[in-house]
Amino acid sequence: MDLGMVNAKGISRKHHKTNTARLAWALITPTALIVFGLVIFPAVFNIWVSFHNVGLHNLNDVFHAPFVGVQNYQRVFKDFSFEFQGWDNWGAAVTTVVYAFSATTLSTTLGLIAALLLNQPFKGKGVARAIFLFPYVAPMVSIAFVWRWILDPRPSGVLNDLLLRLNIIDTSHAFLSTRGLSLIVVILLDAWRYFPFAMLMILSRLQAVDDTLYEAATVDGANSVQKFFFITLPELRYVIGAIFLLRLMWTFNKFDDIFLYTGGGFGTKVLSILTYEFSFRLYDFGRGAATSVIQLLILVVFLVVYISLVMKSVGKE
């Protein structure tokens, strides 16, 4: 073969690799810039603010704010709204953990039940699916407005009026403004709103399960309960694990639901609400940033423990 042809092919390959690399960088760069501008830089800047005294007095010259070390973190830990004060006042940290795990567990369980129901053949399945999906697609502001009207302790409240007419209760109850009860109601409302996400994910996996597994189990004399625990659940365990992980992260950082329902009062103040209050009510941006970093660290600890447990269970198989 001619040496010139070999050199030409080598040069052509180099040009092709160069063009491919340039195309790859051209495609990656816009996304990388967006991620840097909207995720990485704000996160790093937030950590920087948490170690400085930043408020309205120096907001225009924030990069010259005085360094205070871990003082903002100490103030957060000593704050009445953050600390566990007893069973009557859990504090924002404990409330966040209870709210996140309870709402995530309940929404995942409801999603599993709904998916099992929709996986069965019956008339009106499309209508049932649309009804189940409604809480997830409806605007949060509209949902909060309707539920506040339903749970209103005044005579105009639908639920109180109904319960009074049925003689189930003697006096009206303030479902969203009673310490203890309000947190339970918010957890139930959160589970109702977000169970369709789990339902869709679980249903898609259920429809991919091989029917021959159930047919073989039927031949062996297995009943419905045995099929569920020995076939369905093992097939769903990874999907349920992924759903629980995602919903836990989202619920742990949830702000709008609780803020619209209770404003963070009556024992429902979570860390995201506390961050908002420090930053935009007290204008103590350093303490607000420190609270958000603490929230992130708590979430990371739970995620590391959860993922390590999952990896151990996978390794045993």
Residues of each region from the PLM?
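Short, Lys/Arg-rich, polar N-terminal cytosolic tail immediately upstream
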Residues: 1-19
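A structural signal for multi-pass alpha-helical bundles of membrane permease subunits
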Residues: 19-317
